């Protein structure tokens, strides 16, 4: 049942204030001179009492909407077998001719396929939803060979808030698109699924043993340091000794630093790094490529193994 619409009628009444019966009035012979309003002691008060004022009356009248079954609108040069169909040139004209006091259960629009882009406006269909009841059906019949895109009709359904239901192709090549108005009620209730609140306190507990595991081996030494530590028998994974070391690793590190550096081979000419063109006959790097001074240990060993 559609609730009745309330129309409010406003009536403005202009009245004049009337002075009290006991109020003294000036005699007819005593007329105030222009510019002088003090000829009578109550002249100013009498002028105020005759000022008009307004009263606002409201009257509410209930007018029930007319419930109708189907509204048929023919656009452009299309035709319909419904004698009560409304003919209009465009969607804008059809919206202006519609009886807005009635509520319809279904709306039928008829348009020729060749005139779809000219007479059908996607924005105007939303104006018809005001006269449709909840769950009302809206159908658009495209007469003729509807080989062109029907995207304007689908767009109008979307802008009007309609749910697109179906599209039917007839034997003569015409198409009928159907949509339904959603029943959006203000008293509808949506169910919210909340997660179960398990306040047993176990989520706040942390296992200390899990914090000590290193599954990704992030706490270990780099591979190069580990290989060097394994080769030298170091059990500290190549890390520097502690300041208060008691395992003897600090003494071993000091002895390792006190070792003499390896002797670097060189000749008397001092031009070993420049290449064979500058080296002498007794150069130990004869036959090897040139290198930077101090990088003798990086020189490739190009000698034969035989």
Curated annotation (Swiss-Prot):
The answer to whether UniProt assigns keyword Mitochondrion to this entry is yes
Keywords assigned by UniProt, alphabetized: 2Fe-2S, 4Fe-4S, Cytoplasm, Iron, Iron-sulfur, Metal-binding, Mitochondrion
The UniProt entry annotates the motif Cx2C motif 2 at 280-283
Ranges where the record places region N-terminal SAM-like domain: 59-190
Query: Which InterPro entries does the UniProt record give?
Result: Anamorsin, CIAPIN1
As cofactor, the record names: [2Fe-2S] cluster; [4Fe-4S] cluster
Q: Which residues does the annotation say bind [2Fe-2S] cluster?
A: 236, 242, 245, 247
Where are the stretches annotated Fe-S binding site B? Answer: 269-283
Region Fe-S binding site A, annotated ranges: 236-247
Listed GO CC annotations: mitochondrial intermembrane space
Which Gene Ontology terms describe the biological processes this protein takes part in?
iron-sulfur cluster assembly
Chain segments carrying region Disordered: 1-51, 252-272
Q: Does the keyword Cytoplasm apply?
A: yes
Locus of motif Cx2C motif 1: 269-272
Question: What's a single GO MF annotation on this record?
Answer: 2 iron, 2 sulfur cluster binding
Looking at the record, which segments are called Linker?
191-218
Recorded hits in PANTHER family, A to Z, give: ANAMORSIN
Per its database record, what is this protein's job?
A: Component of the cytosolic iron-sulfur (Fe-S) protein assembly (CIA) machinery. Required for the maturation of extramitochondrial Fe-S proteins. Part of an electron transfer chain functioning in an early step of cytosolic Fe-S biogenesis, facilitating the de novo assembly of a [4Fe-4S] cluster on the cytosolic Fe-S scaffold complex. Electrons are transferred from NADPH via a FAD- and FMN-containing diflavin oxidoreductase.
- Of which family is this protein a member? Belongs to the anamorsin family.
| Subunit annotation | Monomer.
Q: What is known of its domains?
A: The C-terminal domain binds 2 Fe-S clusters but is otherwise mostly in an intrinsically disordered conformation.
Q: What is this protein called?
A: Anamorsin homolog
């Amino acid at each position: 049942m559609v609730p009745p619409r309330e129309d409010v009628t406003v009536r403005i009444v202009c009245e004049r204030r009337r002075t009290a019966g006991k109020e003294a009035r000036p005699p007819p012979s005593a007329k105030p001179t222009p510019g002088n309003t003090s000829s009578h002691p109550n002249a100013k008060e009498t002028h105020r009492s005759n000022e008009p004022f307004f009263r606002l009356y409201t009257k509410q009248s209930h007018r029930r909407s007319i419930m109708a079954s189907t509204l048929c609108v023919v656009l452009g040069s299309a035709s319909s077998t419904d004698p009560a169909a409304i003919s209009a040139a465009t969607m804008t004209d059809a919206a202006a001719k519609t009886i807005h006091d009635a509520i319809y259960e279904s709306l039928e629009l008829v348009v020729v396929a060749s005139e779809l882009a000219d007479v059908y406006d996607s924005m105007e269909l939303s104006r018809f939803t005001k006269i449709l009841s909840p769950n009302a059906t809206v159908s658009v019949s495209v007469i003729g060979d509807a080989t062109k895109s029907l995207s304007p009709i689908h767009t109008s359904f979307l802008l009007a808030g309609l749910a697109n239901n179906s599209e039917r192709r007839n034997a003569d090549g015409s198409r009928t698109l159907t949509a339904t108005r959603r029943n959006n009620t203000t008293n509808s209730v949506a169910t919210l699924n909340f997660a179960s609140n398990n306040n047993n306190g176990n989520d706040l507990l942390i296992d200390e043993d899990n914090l000590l595991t290193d599954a990704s081996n992030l706490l270990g030494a780099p591979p190069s340091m580990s290989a060097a530590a394994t080769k030298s028998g170091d059990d500290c994974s190549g890390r520097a000794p502690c300041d208060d070391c008691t395992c003897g690793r600090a003494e071993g590190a000091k002895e390792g630093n006190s070792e003499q550096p390896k002797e670097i081979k060189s000749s008397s000419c001092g031009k070993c790094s420049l290449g064979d063109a500058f080296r002498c006959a007794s150069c130990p790097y004869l036959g090897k490529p040139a290198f930077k001074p101090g990088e003798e240990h990086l020189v490739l060993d190009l000698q034969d193994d035989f």
